Amino acid sequence: MSRKKRKRGRGRVLILVVLLALIVFGVFARGIFTSGKTTTEHAQRELHTYAEQHETSLADYPDALVQLYARNPDARDFVRDYPKKKDLTPTIDLSNLSGSKTVPLLLQWDERWGYREYNESIIGLAGCGPTCLSMATIYLTGDTTKDPLWMCRFAEQNQFNVPGSGSKWALISEGGRMLGLDVTQIPLDKDRIYRNLDVGNPIIVVVGPGDFTTDGHFLVLTGHSGDKITLNDPNSPTNSAKSWDCDTLAGQIQALWVLRRAG
C-alpha cells in the first residue's frame, strides 16, 4: 500500500471517529440540557396537535401556560385540560388529610383549584405561597377547609398578594399568625433548621433563581436525614420526591419561617 493511500485511510478513520464523537456528545448534551423540559416551539406543536384532537385551539392556551408546559413535565395534563376545565368549579374536599402525620403535598396546579383566578393570573401559575401556607396549616391544625383556593382568597382579602405577580412574604409571617399559628423567621442556620425539622415544625422558605425557579418561589421544608432535606414543592412532585443537599438549598434560600401551632 502506498504512503498516500495509508494517509487517506487514516484520514477517513479520523473523520469517522470525530463524527461519532460529535453524535454521542450531541445526544448527551441534549439530554443534560433538556432534563425533561422542552422548547417553547416544541410545546406549541404538541399543544396544537392535542388541541386539534380535542376540538380546541392553540389560541385557547395563554402564553404563560405554554411556558409551564415547556418547563414542567409534571404539569402537562393540567395545561392540556385548560380549555375544557378552566371554567369548572369542582368541589374541594381535603378531609382525608385531617390528622396527617406528615406535611401533605398540595400542588398549585391541582385541577380542583389551579384554574381559579389569583393575582390577575391563576393559582396554577401564581399560587405557590398560598399553597405552601395551606399545606402547613392543614398539617398543624387539621383544618382541611384551609385549602389553596381558600388561602388565595385570604391573601387577596388581606392584601398579601402582589397583583400581576405572586405573594408577599408577609403572607407567611403576618398571615400565618392571623390563622392562629406561631410563626418565627429564622436565620439560615443548619443546626436550627435541623432542630425544628426534628420536632416536626415545617419551615416555609422563599428561594430565588436556581433549581426551582427563575424568579422567586415558596417551598415547605418537611424533614431531613443528615444533611439531606426533604421538601414539598407546590409546583413539582418530582422535586418533592427528591432529597436535597442542605448546602445546595442554602445557596438559593432568601428567607425562612418556622411554623408551629400556637399555644
Please give the residue ranges for each predicted region.
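Active-site-adjacent structural segments surrounding the nucleophilic cysteine of cysteine proteases
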Residues: 3, 11-18, 24-160
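Conserved active-site-adjacent core of cysteine acyl-enzyme catalytic domains
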Residues: 25-52, 93-94, 101, 138, ...
